[in-house]
């Protein structure tokens, strides 16, 4: 579950809410929205992705004029770097309070969190410290995932996996950063540069899946790839992805595709085993 729509609905910058003594607005609105979804799917887990507004998006909120103007907000002050910054930490703490309220006051312990756009292991460790100070301590009933969308996470996949309970591969941002391609560039898109099926991107995804499983954590993927390309979805199944998000209109088709791939894998394994016995 993404939280950006909650921020858009409130329409006010979190730090401006704090400065005007209205921090409870974010806590209450966010906790109410999360509670509605968490109750509907209980006891299945609801993984809430903490805010991932970029500076240009925050500037569009009331009180957002405090945001710096960045030339490239996509790789700017967002995600984990924002949470641990003295200029925004108190805003992140409001989000933590909302999560704690959902879990404590409503008993919805199926609510977990996911940290977007993390870049370093020390950043993750610091975010976890802040969360723990707000009563959100990582344990068997409260899991912390990260979005794996920055190449640094790929290069240190096992180290990151040792800090969290799950990876969610953000294939859109990962493709941009691995390939050095702006996905909004019509020229490069038309030339075929933005493609999650590129061998470099697939190698990065493979590394993340295998590192996650080596450390005993789950690995999922979100992005357009599995919905658009059946061969890409098949690749993910072969590599052992635990789950994938797809567009609503492709859910039934993708389920059949995954079932078919898994059946072929089982039959292939059985034939191989029978051949060894002979």
Regions found by a protein language model. Give the residues of each.
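Conserved alpha/beta-domain cores
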Residues: 1-278
